[in-house]
A protein has these predicted regions:
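Acyl-donor-binding surface of acyltransferase catalytic domains
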Residues: 1-12, 82, 98-105, 110-187, ...
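Short amphipathic alpha-helix that is part of the acyltransferase structural core
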Residues: 2-50, 57, 63-66, 71, ...
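Conserved donor-binding loop and adjoining core beta-sheet/short helix segment
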Residues: 21-24, 28-132, 240-268
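Alpha-helical elements of Rossmann-like donor-binding domains used by nucleotide-donor carbohydrate transfer enzymes
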Residues: 26-30, 108, 112, 194, ...
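Conserved acetyl-CoA-binding loop-helix of GNAT-fold acetyltransferases
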Residues: 102-115, 142, 267, 273-286, ...
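Active-site/acyl-donor-binding loops of N-acyltransferases
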Residues: 143-162, 234-236, 286-335
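A mid-sequence, solvent-exposed acidic-amphipathic segment
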Residues: 209-210, 217-237, 241-242, 247
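Extended hydrophobic/aromatic segments used for targeting, binding, or gating
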Residues: 245-267, 271-297
Length: 335
């Protein structure tokens, strides 16, 4: 991801070093200034970092320091993508504090990251930003990054939602029931393995830039049940007998207590077209409404017509799209 990166108008001398845990407050502040509508917290960021499987995948973060007082003024990350894994493919992220932009700091961080990745034999780079970030988009394009994919962000006013208008969509087909992950964990603590298998199967059908790859169960499990964002009572699962056939889950935000985020909604191929996805989404909306949440936010590929259709029908309002950018390093100068 790239956040508010601009080309320099004056040079600034900064020190670049490896990230240390005491840098969390500074990088969270920088990230929240870059994307204030999607703020994170130190706890959330630390959880993401600590649950990333560094035995299987490469992960590294740098910070840029103002040399006179060691203030963190920028950051850069790179890592393998566990759910779209290729040993030569990496996600990259850059952000510079607003007061320190246009001084060449982003360029210094970029050069450091690309140099590292070239030494690791990287050939593909991936990063993301919102279409409103015109400076970041221009910055990426000037460095050879091209647009690969677009995803709508959409938002639903949960409190204004008229559940009565969807009464006919609440009912389930014969033989299908909906339970929560909390209920399933109480019934069988080992249920996560079956849920993971379904999640991986459903992910194969989601439009994406790079082919889906199966990441570690352990990472997925931590995200589902131990993340600061986890809500097992808002993780809805459709069952046909004892078999899982669909899901739709919500996650919370520590900074935005009245906002919930849709994680993933999907139904197995042989059960599609029967209203199960809509019924799952309605349970999620009902949860948000009954818990006093103001808004639900979600993201969908612009190519995912079926899910976009459901969201439009429910009343989700499209926001500016998020763009995936990529760069091929195969012919990049390695000198």
């Amino acid at each position: 991801m790239a956040g508010f990166i601009q080309d320099k108008v004056q040079q600034s001398h900064v020190e670049i070093r490896d990230f240390e845990p005491e840098d969390y407050p500074a990088i969270v502040e920088i990230e929240n200034l870059a994307y204030p509508e999607h703020p994170t917290t130190v706890e959330e960021r630390r959880f993401e970092d600590e649950t990333f499987d560094r035995k299987r995948y490469v992960w590294r973060r740098y910070v840029a320091l103002e040399p006179s007082n060691d203030t963190v003024v920028g950051e850069a990350d790179y890592n393998h993508l566990p759910w779209a894994y290729d040993p030569a493919r990496f996600g990259i992220w850059f952000a510079v504090h607003p007061q320190w932009r246009r001084r060449g700091i982003g360029s210094r961080l970029y050069e450091k990251v690309v140099g590292d990745l070239q030494s690791r034999g990287a050939t593909q780079l991936r990063t993301w930003t919102q279409e409103t970030q015109s400076d970041a988009i221009g910055w990426l394009r000037r460095r050879g990054h091209g647009e690969l994919h677009r995803a709508w962000e959409s938002r639903l006013d949960a409190q204004a939602f008229d559940m009565g208008a969807f009464r006919g969509h609440w009912d389930l087909p014969a033989g299908i029931k909906i339970v929560t992950l909390a209920e399933e964990l109480a019934r069988d603590p080992e249920c996560l393995k079956e849920l993971f298998e379904m999640d991986c199967e459903l992910a194969l059908d989601v439009p994406r830039v790079d082919p889906f790859t199966r990441g570690p169960f352990e990472m997925w499990r931590e995200w589902v049940i131990n993340s600061p964002r986890s809500l097992p009572d808002a993780f809805f699962i459709a069952k046909a007998g004892d078999r899982y056939v669909g899901q739709s889950d919500l996650g919370s935000s520590e900074q935005l207590s009245d906002v919930l985020y849709t994680g993933f909604t999907g139904v197995r191929r042989e059960y599609r077209g029967r209203g199960i996805a809509m019924a799952l989404k309605l349970r999620a909306v009902d949860y948000a409404k009954s818990h006093g949440c103001r808004e639900i936010r979600t993201w969908n590929s612009t190519l995912n017509a079926p899910m976009l259709g459901i969201n439009v029908k429910l009343g989700f309002v499209k926001q500016p799209v998020w763009i995936t950018f990529g760069k091929d390093l195969t012919h990049e100068d390695r000198s």
